[in-house]
């Protein structure tokens, strides 16, 4: 069975970020389409992402649609003694509401979306497997255009009993404030660098003018 591009991208991003987050431990990411919510073995932890943004493509009628309600289930386990961890992952599918086929279709995601989702996964992993403060989660539903209301009858996750939550206004405001603060910080850094460059350019030009005047003054005295 061929491996989809999205699956390869998930593994690539996960391994790169885990190498930075926990370089002393060895982690693996396994795609498991049979994963069930809340069915955990001893020592396993769960993280559920309910509002990922993805695009679906019907393999029967070629209809495409965008959804901001893609559900992704993660089960995580860390063997502290062996320093080996495992993440099992399932991306829930959706049915095409255009042609009504019973064939479930997989979603595709942009790399930037996958990176944000992996950041959330690592945040949960730090909290549940390492007892650390993982940091702030990113809320992907904010500013994600959707193709319409979520239709639970076409959603695999809804059919298996996963109830979608909606982030509160407070969480959305915090997420927007976090994004604005990051942008302002970047702009401030750019402005600071710009003025530092202009200041150095000014002093460099002034030094050249002084050297130039001294040189010609010396030549005038010699003549």
From Swiss-Prot:
The signal peptide here is: none
Q: Please list the residue ranges that the record places on the Cytoplasmic side of the membrane.
A: 1-193
Q: In which tissues is it expressed?
A: Predominantly expressed in olfactory and vomeronasal organs, in mature olfactory sensory neurons.
Query: Where does this protein reside within or beyond the cell?
Result: Cell membrane
Give yes or no: UniProt keyword Hydrolase: no
Transmembrane region(s): 194-216
Q: Which UniProt keywords apply?
A: Cell membrane, Membrane, Metal-binding, Transmembrane, Transmembrane helix, Zinc, Zinc-finger
How is the quaternary structure described?
Interacts with olfactory receptors.
Q: How does it sit in the membrane?
A: Single-pass type III membrane protein
Which ranges form a coiled coil?
A: none
Q: Which residues lie on this side of the membrane: Extracellular?
A: 217-223
Q: Which gene encodes it?
A: Rtp2
| Any one GO biological process | protein insertion into membrane
3CxxC-type zinc finger positions in the chain? 52-161
MF (Gene Ontology): olfactory receptor binding; zinc ion binding
Highest taxon of the lineage = Eukaryota
Its predominant location is membrane
Source species? Mus musculus (Mouse)
One of this protein's Pfam families, by short name? Answer: Zn_ribbon_3CxxC
Q: Which family does it belong to?
A: Belongs to the TMEM7 family.
Single GO cellular component annotation?
cell surface
Protein name, UniProt field:
Receptor-transporting protein 2
Its biological function? Specifically promotes functional cell surface expression of olfactory receptors, but not of other GPCRs.
């Amino acid at each position: 069975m061929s491996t989809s591009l999205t699956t390869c991208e998930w593994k690539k991003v996960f391994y790169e970020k885990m190498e930075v987050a926990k370089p002393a431990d060895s982690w693996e990411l396994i795609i498991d389409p049979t994963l069930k919510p809340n069915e955990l073995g001893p020592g396993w932890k769960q993280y559920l992402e309910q509002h990922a943004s993805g695009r679906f493509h019907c393999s029967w009628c070629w209809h495409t649609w965008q959804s901001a309600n893609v559900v992704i289930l993660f089960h995580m386990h860390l063997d502290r003694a062996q320093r080996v961890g495992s993440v099992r992952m399932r991306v829930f599918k959706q049915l095409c509401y255009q042609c009504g086929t019973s064939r479930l279709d997989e979603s595709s995601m942009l790399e930037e979306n996958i990176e944000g989702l992996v950041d959330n996964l690592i945040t949960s992993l730090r909290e549940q497997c390492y007892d650390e403060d993982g940091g702030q989660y990113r809320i992907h539903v904010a500013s994600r255009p959707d193709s319409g209301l979520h239709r639970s009858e076409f959603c695999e996750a809804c059919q298996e009993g996963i109830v979608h939550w909606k982030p509160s206004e407070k969480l959305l405001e915090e997420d927007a404030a976090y994004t604005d603060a990051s942008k302002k910080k970047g702009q401030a850094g750019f402005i600071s660098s710009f003025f530092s460059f202009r200041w150095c350019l000014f002093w460099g030009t002034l030094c050249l003018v002084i050297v130039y005047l001294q040189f010609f003054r010396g030549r005038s005295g010699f003549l």
